[in-house]
């Protein structure tokens, strides 16, 4: 139809040939691909009905025809969907069995109050189908009270029918009256608050109002859904005539037909929606009644997806107010488990750690007499550390998994080579059956001498833990700053979520940077999305070029910052725009304070204090500095002996708390 193409074809033979070839291949499939869950069934061998194709990347046979051609060839196509959620449910049920709680998930009550309270409060992190922020917002508005509400929401939450969610919620909650379309069909739409939601409703309306058979109603639905104009033109007079015979006037019948035509285009199959809703309800029921087993089941399915595990950790601690036991070679299993109403972190969830190696640790522990390792040397004797590998062992140390055996992680990390050699010697001796005459193999081998090193500071432990786990688990870098942040009017994420419900808020927030993505606008201006965490959760802040220019050097992973933000709420989702940012030690510095006084009870403690101060003096990330004085309080002396150590040492809440943890330090005071 394009005149210029016609002219080009007349002028050049090659263009004419190209257009001729193009017309022949236009509309044909460009590649062979397979549906993830599509299976075709025929009444005879498939090669007698359709051409087949062997995918070179698999052993699977596929048809060369597309979906529509397959159906026209007389084959029936089914989609057999496999859901990871079914594994989540089975994981949770298996964990419940370990404490003799046997549940037939297919026969649970469908009117459990706790489950619908969970839905209505939108506490649906990890609940199938309803964990997105949009779904959570819809749940808060709908306040579901029955399984039919969940079925309807699954069907409505798609482009097109989504616009009917507000009307459904308003009618359900009595804010709006249900509008009658026609008395003949009101009962059909009662369960969906007067809105056509399902394909089955389209068929039933055609059957009841216009006298269609079920087969005829299905043909009508298909014609409407696929917008087949010829079929629609043929169906309208048939529908009008049938409706008239049932006493429906022509105008109303035409209105209903138009309504059916509109909704049939995106009406959802009710049985499909119901199947998904039941699975959603089962996950919600498990979360409402057995939250730890459910969350452990979820986390076992996302073992190495750090971003998801971080969200689930936040949900367990801050959402469900339950506890997580950090990785521990004496308590943890290969996967996530539940004991004594606590979720035990999985050994395999650490970075660079495999399940086979962790199973060796668990097996050795269970074979021991006490069912636990007493110290790192017993671990070396019972577990062939060489088979675990140095990298996984390092991650176990960094995560604190050996803390019950030796709490000095820096010592263990530097001593791993000698421990692995010790373990190898013992196990080699066992293999060669050269054990001593009267004892176990290896008892005559001397235990290696461990390195002598200072313990990591609490802040260093968290950094190393983050390397191994992917997020902060046993604590948070801002824990030491809690009182200082409160004193300076800094708001937590949890508090900000509450404040913003009443409208936009200007506030100060503090957090540890975990990630950053830089972008450019259409005009070439820079902006960034920065991911930040505080002890109450995770959040994202948007920064535009003016703020980036002045604070970019602080916006790197691991840095603690204070931000002035403008907070708003969109569809129940917190939006933060940063107006200013600075390092936490700069933001919280108290200019009225000169420094610290460290009170100790013996001269021996002084060297430990000096060692710590020397270590933190090298920390470039600590911006506040001041004097440090040592005060020796000894009962044998008439008074305090004060010694000025220096006038420019790093001073911040993390340093203060690290000093307080030193044995022999009585107190630390600012002055």
Tell me the role of every PLM-derived stretch.
Residues 1-671:
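Noncatalytic, beta-rich nucleic-acid-contacting surfaces in large DNA/RNA-processing enzymes
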């Amino acid at each position: 139809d394009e005149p210029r193409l016609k002219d080009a074809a007349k002028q050049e033979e090659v263009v004419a040939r190209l257009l001729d070839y193009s017309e022949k291949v236009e509309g044909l499939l460009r590649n062979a691909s397979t549906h993830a869950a599509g299976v075709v069934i025929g009444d005879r061998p498939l090669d007698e009905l359709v051409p087949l194709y062997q995918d070179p990347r698999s052993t699977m046979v596929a048809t060369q025809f597309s979906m529509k051609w397959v159906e026209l060839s007389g084959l029936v196509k089914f989609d057999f969907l496999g859901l990871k959620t079914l594994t989540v449910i089975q994981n949770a049920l298996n964990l419940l069995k370990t404490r003799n709680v046997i549940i037939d998930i297919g026969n649970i009550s469908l009117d459990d109050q706790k489950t619908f309270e969970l839905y209505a409060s939108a506490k649906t992190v990890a609940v199938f189908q309803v964990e997105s922020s949009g779904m959570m917002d819809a749940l808060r508005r709908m306040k579901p009270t029955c399984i039919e509400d969940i079925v309807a929401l699954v069907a409505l939450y798609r482009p097109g029918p989504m616009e009917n969610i507000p009307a459904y919620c308003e009618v359900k909650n009595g804010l709006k009256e249900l509008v009658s379309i026609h008395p003949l069909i009101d009962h059909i739409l009662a369960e969906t608050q007067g809105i056509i939601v399902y394909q089955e409703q389209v068929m039933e309306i055609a059957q009841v109002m216009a006298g269609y058979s079920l087969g005829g109603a299905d043909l009508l639905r298909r014609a409407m859904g696929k917008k087949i104009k010829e079929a629609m033109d043929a169906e309208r007079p048939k529908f009008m005539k049938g409706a008239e015979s049932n006493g429906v006037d022509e105008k109303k019948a035409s209105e209903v037909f138009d309504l059916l035509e509109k909704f049939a285009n995106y009406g959802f199959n009710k049985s499909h929606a119901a199947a998904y809703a039941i699975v959603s309800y089962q996950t919600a029921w498990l979360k409402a009644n057995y939250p730890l087993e459910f969350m452990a089941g979820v986390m076992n399915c996302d073992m190495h997806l750090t971003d998801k595990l971080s969200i689930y950790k936040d949900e367990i601690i801050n959402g469900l107010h339950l506890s997580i036991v950090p990785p521990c070679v004496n308590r943890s299993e290969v996967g996530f488990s539940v004991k004594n109403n606590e979720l035990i972190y999985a050994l395999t969830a650490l970075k660079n750690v495999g399940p086979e190696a962790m199973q060796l640790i668990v097996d050795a522990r269970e074979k021991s007499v006490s069912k636990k390792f007493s110290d790192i040397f017993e671990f070396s004797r019972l577990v062939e550390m060489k088979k675990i590998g140095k990298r996984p062992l390092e991650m176990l140390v960094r995560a604190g998994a050996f803390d019950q055996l030796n709490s000095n992680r820096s010592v263990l990390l530097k001593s791993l080579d000698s421990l692995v050699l010790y373990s190898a010697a013992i196990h080699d001796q066992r293999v060669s059956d050269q054990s001593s005459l009267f004892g176990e193999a290896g008892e005559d081998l001397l235990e290696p001498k461990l390195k002598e090193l200072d313990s990591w500071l609490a802040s260093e432990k968290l950094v190393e833990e983050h390397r191994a786990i992917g997020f902060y688990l046993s604590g948070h870098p801002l824990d030491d700053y809690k009182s200082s942040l409160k004193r300076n009017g800094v708001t937590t994420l949890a508090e900000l979520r509450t404040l913003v419900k009443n409208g936009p808020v200007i506030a100060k927030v503090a957090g540890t940077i975990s990630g950053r993505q830089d972008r450019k606008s259409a005009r070439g201006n820079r902006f960034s999305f920065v991911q930040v965490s505080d002890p109450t959760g995770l959040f994202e802040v948007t920064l535009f070029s003016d703020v980036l220019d002045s604070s970019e050097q602080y916006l790197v992973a691991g840095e603690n910052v204070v931000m002035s933000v403008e907070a708003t709420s969109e569809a129940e989702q917190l939006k933060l725009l940063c107006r200013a940012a600075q390092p936490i030690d700069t933001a919280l510095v108290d200019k009225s304070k000169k420094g610290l006084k460290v009170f100790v009870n013996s001269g021996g403690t002084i060297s430990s204090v000096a060692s710590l101060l020397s270590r933190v003096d090298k920390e470039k990330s600590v911006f506040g500095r001041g004097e440090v004085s040592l005060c020796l309080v000894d009962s044998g002396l008439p008074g305090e002996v004060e010694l000025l150590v220096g006038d420019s040492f790093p001073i911040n809440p993390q340093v203060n708390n690290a000093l307080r943890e030193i044995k022999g330090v009585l107190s630390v005071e600012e002055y």
